[in-house]
C-alpha cells in the first residue's frame, strides 16, 4: 500500500492536473500550483474520502502546503512519518 505522502501527491496531481515531479512537501496549493478556492474545497473533499477522515473548515483553511495536508492526515490517522 502506498504511503500517506504518496497518496496525497497522487490526489493533488490528479485534482490539479500537475506532474507529480513538481509536487513536494513545501509546494503551496495556491502559490505554486495555482489552485483557487474551488480547487482547494475539492481537494479537501477528495482527501477526506480517500483517508476516511473529516477535515473541519478551520483546519482546512490552515492547510496551505502539501506537507501540511500530509501532517494533518498522519495526525488524524495516528501515524508518524
Curated annotation (Swiss-Prot):
Per the record's keyword annotation, is Lipid biosynthesis included, yes or no? yes
What is the recorded post-translational modification?
A: 4'-phosphopantetheine is transferred from CoA to a specific serine of apo-ACP by AcpS. This modification is essential for activity because fatty acids are bound in thioester linkage to the sulfhydryl of the prosthetic group.
Alphabetical keyword list: Cytoplasm, Fatty acid biosynthesis, Fatty acid metabolism, Lipid biosynthesis, Lipid metabolism, Phosphopantetheine, Phosphoprotein
The record places domain Carrier at 2-77
Q: What is its main location?
A: cytoplasm
Q: Which residues carry this modification: O-(pantetheine 4'-phosphoryl)serine?
A: 37
Q: What is this protein called?
A: Acyl carrier protein
